[in-house]
Structures are given as structure tokens and as C-alpha cells.
Regions:
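A domain-level signal for the structural core that forms small-molecule/cofactor-binding pockets
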Residues: 2-120
Length: 120
């Protein structure tokens, strides 16, 4: 735990996805909130079909959802959100003429019902 889900629009061709995931994992690790780097799992999905607003102008987004085991304070969650957002801002060569929206959402996972096993 945690699980980081990153969705990004296909028009963000300059985004180095693997590098961005590693950067976000490092942000989480240095926060001191997670016991081991092995606990952090991240993945990215390129969104081919999307619409931002109603305009036909070029727009895109990166949306990060971080799922955490419940029990962290609002202050800790806010710090994690702001740190991830700051790292996203430095993530890529943003395409000329494309308005890009970046967002981070933290979601609590029920600690009592979460199960995990490591094999190997």
C-alpha cells in the first residue's frame, strides 16, 4: 500500500510515463508515511477517448488517484496531495497550445477489508 493510479490523455506525447511514475513513487517514499518502497505500487493508463469541457480547443489532463489505507490525518493527506501535484507539474514537456489540467485525489481504503500477500 499505497496504490497510485495515473491517467493521462494521449495528446501528452512528451510525458515520460515510467520516469513520472518513479518520480511519484519517490515523492511518496520520502514522505515518511510508508514503511518500504516495495509497498508503493503505481500504474499508468493512456486515455485515448476523452473530452475536457465543451470547447474543441486542444486540452488534456493527468489525473492521479492515490489509494491509502484509512487512518491518516487530513494534514498528512493534504501534504501528500500537494507533494504529488508539485511533482506532476515538473513531469513533462507540455505540448504547445494544449491546456493541461493536473489533479490529485486521495482515497481512503478500508483497513479492515484490505488483503494482500507477497509471493516470491
Amino acid at each position: 500500500m499505497p496504490h497510485l493510479h495515473l491517467e493521462y490523455t494521449a495528446n501528452l506525447t512528451g510525458l515520460a510515463v515510467e520516469k513520472t511514475l518513479l518520480r511519484l513513487n519517490n515523492v511518496l517514499m520520502v514522505s515518511g508515511q510508508f514503511a518500504s518502497e516495495l509497498d508503493i505500487k503505481s500504474r499508468a493508463v493512456k486515455v485515448e477517448s476523452y473530452q475536457v469541457g465543451t470547447s474543441l480547443n486542444a486540452r488534456g489532463f493527468i489525473a492521479v488517484k492515490l489509494s491509502l489505507l484509512s487512518g491518516r490525518s487530513p494534514q498528512v493527506k493534504q501534504q501528500l496531495s500537494q507533494s504529488l501535484l508539485a511533482a506532476l507539474q515538473d513531469a513533462g514537456d507540455w505540448p504547445e497550445g494544449v491546456q493541461v489540467q493536473l489533479s490529485v485525489q486521495l482515497v481512503d481504503m478500508d483497513r479492515d477489508s484490505y488483503s494482500k500477500v507477497a509471493i516470491g
